[in-house]
Amino acid sequence: MKEQISAELTHLTESENTTVFGYELLRGFLIPEILGKDTPEILYWAGKKLARKYPVETQEEIIDFFTQASWGDLEIKNETKDELEFELTSPLMVSRVKSKAEHFFQLEAGFLAQQIEHQKGVVAEAFEHPVKKLQKVQFTVKWDRKDKIE
């Protein structure tokens, strides 16, 4: 029985690696190749579009979405009256941040901006801050409470 479980887990791990490899091929090579210099801006707006398609009502649900999308472990670090700071970690982040190739986290930034905009009812904008030494990405989402969504 233990051997069967071990074999299933090994197969699952190989499957996950294939999925990760395919995902990274698309994200790290193909998309930037197609979009060129506009990659960060288009990924940001794509993230906003994803958030509109999959709106969530709480910050906890945002965190759950990141986990389900295999984007990594999202954590809220700080919140003020007009700003929210997140931190994202995952094995993929480690490999992306370590690599010398240019990587963007604008898909995630756009997603965060739109979800916070939806939840707070004000226009929001997000900024990514890769921290290579710590192998993670920090996001700052800012909003103006006077700039309400109509």
Language-model-derived ranges and their functions:
Residues 1-92, 96-103, 145-150:
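N-terminal accessory segment detector
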Residues 98-126:
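Long, amphipathic alpha-helical coupling/dimerization segments that relay conformational signals between
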Residues 78, 86, 123-150:
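Short terminal or interdomain "cap/linker" segment that borders an active site or interface and mediates
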